[in-house]
Swiss-Prot record:
Family statement: Belongs to the AspA/AstE family. Succinylglutamate desuccinylase subfamily.
Protein name: Succinylglutamate desuccinylase
Annotated keywords: Arginine metabolism, Hydrolase, Metal-binding, Zinc
Zinc found in the keyword field: yes
Active site: E215
Cofactor: Zn(2+)
Metabolic or biological pathway, per its Swiss-Prot or TrEMBL entry: Amino-acid degradation; L-arginine degradation via AST pathway; L-glutamate and succinate from L-arginine: step 5/5
Gene symbol of the encoding locus: astE
Length: 332
């Protein structure tokens, strides 16, 4: 196997490879672009016009997606997987990955779409670098652009594997992409309704890619992800890479749950109180009339939506940031 196939080992060691460009026996090109960044280019005769960006490790302790990308990289470097798509692999937050921590100074997945310009430190610099790498990768015209940003969650979930589909002015959510997610094992999709500051929101809104944040289970350390079943997703990614996928038309979305954002719960002060157990699972249902949260000045969040569920509850975020999202069932 080519040395560049050990992308995770290089990243964990903080080393640059001696050879930054290597070719497999059949001519597939591997190019180390920066720390944790590897571009894979198929031979011209096999190129099917798809540009696929796969990112993981934006939060350094979310290891199952990192291990998944490592398996794909090794298969490509050994020649076991022969690409028809161009692929860019990005391990998002190398220093946090080395430490086994969610982040070092600040949550990187809230630093995109220009937010990094307002900050400083390692994560802000890296977010800007990831934007640049994605922009260059998606700069070729007349190609299909797809980005999956892979995560695992801090907490458990009533719906274990789900996706967040960004929003941008003038763009419609793709039924074909939703069907592709369902076929990859994704059980539910949250359709967002305003611009975001995540990595997938950037590639969707600014670079014209179909882009998704995928939540794939609960975060665990390296080597302890046996309970995170990514077999369907891994097989779908392999088919996307080697061009063997039969793309669904999206006429039917049976088996896929759709949700939309009803409200975001914003923490305004240190007096903020979220009236949920610390271990409450994502997609826990909340009844109308339930007092969800309180904050300074008599601010109260009372559930008035039918079928409401909570995702990403986190009362420990900094003031001014989102401490949870209320979602409701949706149709496309």
């Amino acid at each position: 196997m080519l040395a560049l196939g050990k992308l995770l080992d290089l990243t964990l060691a903080g080393r640059e490879p001696t050879e930054k460009i290597q070719l497999t026996a059949d001519g597939t090109r591997l190019h180390w672009l920066a720390e944790g960044a590897l571009e894979v280019t198929p031979i011209g005769a096999r190129d099917n016009g798809v540009d696929l960006l796969l990112s993981a490790g934006i939060h350094g302790n979310e290891t199952a997606p990192i291990e998944l990308l490592e398996r794909l990289v090794r298969k490509l470097a050994s020649g076991e997987l022969k690409p028809a798509a161009r692929v860019l692999f990005l391990l998002g937050n190398p220093e946090a990955i080395r430490r086994g921590e969610r982040f070092v100074e600040q949550d990187m997945n809230r630093l995109f779409n220009g937010r990094h310009e307002e900050g400083s430190g390692n994560e802000a610099f890296r977010a800007a670098e990831l934007e640049r790498l994605a922009q260059v990768f998606f700069s070729r015209g007349e190609r299909d652009r797809l980005h999956y940003d892979l995560h695992t969650a801090i907490r458990g979930s009533r719906i274990e594997q789900f996706a967040l589909y960004p929003w941008a002015e003038g763009r419609e959510h793709s039924r074909a992409e939703l069907a592709r997610l369902r076929d990859a094992g994704i059980e539910a999709v949250l359709l967002q309704n305003k611009p975001g500051i995540t990595f997938s929101a950037y590639t969707y809104g600014q670079l014209g890619a179909e882009a998704f944040t995928l939540e794939l289970g609960k975060a665990r350390p390296f080597g302890q992800n046996q309970q995170v079943n990514l077999e369907r997703l891994e097989r779908r990614l392999e088919m996307l890479i080697d061009g063997s996928e039969e793309r669904p038309d999206g006429a039917h979305l049976d088996g896929l749950k759709l949700f939309s954002v009803s409200r975001e719960v914003i923490k305004h002060s240190d007096h903020f109180r979220l009236h949920l157990d610390d271990d409450v699972a994502n997609f826990t249902e909340l009844s109308p009339g339930y007092l969800l949260a309180e904050d300074i000045g008599g601010t109260r969040w009372v559930v008035d939506e039918v079928g409401a569920r909570i995702i990403f509850p986190n009362p420990r975020v900094k003031n001014g940031l989102r401490a949870g999202i209320l979602v409701v069932p949706a149709k496309l």
